[in-house]
UniProtKB/Swiss-Prot annotation:
This is Large ribosomal subunit protein uL15. It comes from Maricaulis maris (strain MCS10) (Caulobacter maris). Keywords: Ribonucleoprotein, Ribosomal protein, RNA-binding, rRNA-binding. NCBIfam families: rplO_bact. Belongs to the universal ribosomal protein uL15 family.
Amino acid sequence: MRLNELRDNDGATKIRTRVGRGIGSGKGKTGGRGVKGQKSRSGVAIKGFEGGQMPLHMRLPKRGFNKPNRKAWAEVNLGRLEKAIAEGKIDAKKPIDADVLIAAGLVRRALDGVRLLAKGELKSKVEITLAGASKAAIAAVEKAGGKVTLTAVADDAAE
């Protein structure tokens, strides 16, 4: 077998039908679209329209709601915090707060506050002051000999 003998398997590629190329082609003039009407025009595909039948998105019930005053937390996991300390981006001997995390590039914006989560492992002894933290994250920091201080007064800060 040589490179010039390589070819696709039979049926692997389908030849595109060229429509609107004369009546002799069998797909000329209207190009398989029928005559007149909305669907014969170009650029028409009505998303969600089912020919007058009640569309699926309207047949299904409404569910849930969006909490108007929900907090948007910026989240930091213990594993990323430990990695930043190991890389020298954060000094573990100094207190860590939202500004330190932003400067180190762990968080882009503080939003409604920074929240510490327990994914990963923390080996360094650190003193952290943040708006919120999960119970597992607080336990992990205290197990490593550190301390977590929460600044947010919100009910959902320490869940």
